[in-house]
């Protein structure tokens, strides 16, 4: 079963080599790496061309935003399973994709999510926060997950792996949302009936701080506005929870 990892790059030379090395080190052989590059003019392409990833495909295009680029990557992918790995993030160890693939095969899964580490922007080995689901490992009940989402819970999209054919049912990232499209996407995904969704109680990714959603005060408030639109769309009642979660990000600036 082929797994496709989608990475978007835009002058990503500072962190890209570590990202690629974490993919190259994987013990799982049937792995595809799709890169959507925003016409980088630094050393990004040299790093990609020198990487030792066996099945890597690079597509250059003028920026359509992060979600437009991810959509292009998913459309270009050949894998049965899709995951997202940003250019400043790393897979946790060399066996994680093999473990994830095995879970899909053993349990005939549609979706899998796991735990992730958040790290300092300039030191990915310095853990600043841990996201854990507080669930027991195994197949989850859709209704239970939707209830959690209704209370403000949401797994990070970088921890998520899903079958590509689900895109035919739920669609791709909504590009009208510039910051919170992953929130909208995951709700649509988890609201599908009769999916086999598995929680892997293992850390899968180290994710650097400083992403688009929390790089500035302005983006934090833009994200809150988009979150509210999405909550109204799905008739969720998590306004206070989302407000607190977004406002809590402000402390990183002090």
Segment roles from a protein language model:
Residues 207, 215-241:
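Catalytic core of nucleotide-sugar-dependent glycosyltransferases
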Residues 94-130:
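Conserved donor NDP-sugar-binding/catalytic core segment of glycosyltransferases
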Residues 136-222:
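Conserved nucleotide-sugar donor-binding catalytic segment
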Residues 11-25:
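Short, well-formed alpha-helical segments that are part of the catalytic scaffolds
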Residues 37-46, 86:
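A conserved acidic beta->alpha catalytic loop
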Residues 82:
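Short aromatic/hydrophobic "clamp" motif used to bind/position activated sugar donors
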Residues 60-77:
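Glycine-rich, basic loop-to-helix element that forms the pyrophosphate-binding segment
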Residues 31-39, 59-62:
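Short beta-strand/loop segment that forms part of the nucleotide-sugar
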């Amino acid at each position: 079963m082929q797994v496709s990892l989608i990475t978007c790059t835009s002058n990503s030379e500072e962190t890209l080599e570590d990202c690629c090395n974490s993919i190259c080190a994987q013990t799982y052989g049937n792995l595809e790496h799709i890169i959507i590059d925003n016409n980088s003019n630094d050393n990004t392409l040299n790093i990609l061309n020198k990487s030792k990833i066996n099945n890597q495909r690079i597509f250059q295009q003028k920026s359509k935003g992060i979600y437009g680029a991810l959509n292009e990557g998913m459309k270009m992918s050949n894998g049965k399973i899709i995951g997202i790995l940003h250019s400043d993030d790393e897979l946790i160890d060399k066996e994680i994709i093999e473990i994830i693939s095995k879970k899909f095969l053993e349990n005939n899964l549609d979706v899998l999510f796991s735990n992730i580490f958040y790290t300092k922007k300039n030191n990915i080995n310095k853990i600043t926060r841990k996201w854990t689901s507080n669930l027991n490992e195994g197949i989850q009940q859709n209704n239970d997950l939707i209830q959690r989402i209704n209370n403000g819970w949401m797994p990070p999209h970088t921890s998520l792996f899903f079958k590509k054919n689900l895109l035919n049912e739920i669609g791709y990232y909504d590009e009208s949302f510039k910051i919170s499209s992953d929130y909208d996407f995951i709700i649509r995904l988890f609201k599908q009936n009769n999916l086999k969704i598995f929680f892997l109680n293992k850390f899968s990714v180290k994710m650097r701080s400083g992403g688009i959603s929390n790089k500035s005060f302005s983006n934090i408030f833009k994200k809150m506005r988009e979150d509210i639109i999405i909550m109204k769309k799905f008739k969720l009642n998590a306004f206070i929870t989302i407000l607190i979660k977004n406002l809590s990000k402000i402390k990183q600036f002090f």
